[in-house]
């Protein structure tokens, strides 16, 4: 189909073929009162050059902000080569057709991605991505219930991202699945082991285990994993992939390892970009692979013995099983996965470890400086990765607003999600922050607190 505007002759020919005299006549059935006529607030058209200039002017109004917000989406340095490669025509505009084997390059890249994510999580198999971390967790909950067969209850700690918990409830509630929340320890910020004991001998399909949790605190993942599996429940890990460069992978948690690992892939080379698009990842142990949603790429050989890549285990998918499929997800976030694969390949294991280690070191240094401010305290005693919760001596909303006026995004106000914490803020410092950035933040925060 050529993308060429209709000429006046084309329009008259089409009107004549349907017996209409004008375009307006096609809309005669709409009452005049419902017709707006011209849109008064729509400005006249601009040339390409004028639009470019206008967009630059609008962008300059935003300015540059120093960002200390994390909470599930993190500002990491992305090598220029990542998106230079990802936006090549072979990747950027390609699509895996229903005869997927015709796209060997795309399939090979997705296969490499799966290999990297399986290695990073310590699991047996990975799929080719999910929409985002929250929906990946919801799919993991559905997967656990299908595999468990006797229980339709999921335990989710309150230390899991509140938006993730909301998404899980929204997706599973119409399938007769109950979501039960586990309280957190008010001192450590970790999932309360005493809270788990209160469930007695009740049966659950799975326990969700965040690492690190929403507060930035590292959980006792070995104990939680063993607790779940000792009760014949699945252990679902929700992990930050950047943290896995330093921490024990889910596949090695406890005595047997977690059963399913999911998370948000944004830290792996995806820009913040106003909230998306991102991608979710999912990996699992081999016995659960037939319950895993999403595309899975396999490696095989053709009739001549050459290596090739295929979509495998397709009987799980909606284009084969329709309503009986594990999920209606299909190609989804392929371009984001392409960028993540390039990012992981460029950094390699050592580069990923350096990035994670610098993020951890920056957050530790920032917390040390913040705690020297009068009235600023760490809320939880548990160890952290690269973000933590601090309490402020002034209303958190007004403090953050004052910092924003100074072009500093000072953290996430937790009052909406955890009102019991009072004026608490979740702060994050990745490897992108210099000592000068952190010193500036602490200085400005101190001035705001003193002047409030």
From Swiss-Prot:
Protein's UniProt keywords contain Oxidoreductase: yes
EC number: 1.4.4.2
GO MF terms held by the record: glycine dehydrogenase (decarboxylating) activity
Assigned keywords, A-Z: Oxidoreductase
Role description: The glycine cleavage system catalyzes the degradation of glycine. The P protein binds the alpha-amino group of glycine through its pyridoxal phosphate cofactor; CO(2) is released and the remaining methylamine moiety is then transferred to the lipoamide cofactor of the H protein.
Family classification: Belongs to the GcvP family. N-terminal subunit subfamily.
Protein name: Probable glycine dehydrogenase (decarboxylating) subunit 1
Organism: Nitrosospira multiformis (strain ATCC 25196 / NCIMB 11849 / C 71)
